[in-house]
């Protein structure tokens, strides 16, 4: 099982957990969870006017071995208006635009989509059961 929690954080309400969304999916090959502005395909939807987030920004996909990975999907712009990084414990790893990284089995962490032009972010916490 992969469990996700998402909070949209702006400078005005930093530290607030109001509006936190949650989603989970079984660790079965082909299972998908998406994060973005498009509510029709994203289980975790961000505010419509947060244009630094793509319609479908992050895709969590379960592979045939039950391991999960996250991909920062390329949007309609050549240069993204956000930065994405994954934190696991003390380790911080930037995720490249269009890049994919595996999630640690039996581990937890956070993926942050940071607006490049304003002090706001989308924080997605994850827990991947081993």
What is each residue range found by the language model?
Residues 1-50, 61, 100-130:
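Intrinsically disordered, low-complexity acidic Ser/Thr-rich regulatory segments
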Residues 52-55:
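Short coil-to-beta strand junction motifs in C2/discoidin
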Residues 57-114:
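Forkhead-associated
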């Amino acid at each position: 099982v992969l469990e996700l929690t998402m909070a949209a954080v702006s400078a005005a309400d930093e530290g607030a957990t109001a509006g936190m969304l949650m989603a989970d999916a079984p660790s079965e090959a082909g299972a998908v969870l998406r994060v973005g502005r498009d509510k029709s395909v994203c289980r975790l939807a961000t505010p419509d006017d947060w244009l630094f987030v793509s319609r479908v920004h992050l895709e969590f996909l379960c592979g045939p071995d039950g391991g999960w990975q996250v991909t920062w999907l390329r949007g309609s712009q050549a240069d993204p208006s956000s930065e994405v990084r994954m934190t696991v414990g003390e380790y911080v790893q930037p995720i490249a635009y269009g890049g994919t990284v595996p999630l640690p089995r039996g581990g937890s962490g956070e993926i942050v989509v940071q607006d490049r032009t304003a002090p706001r972010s989308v924080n997605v916490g994850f827990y991947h059961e081993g």
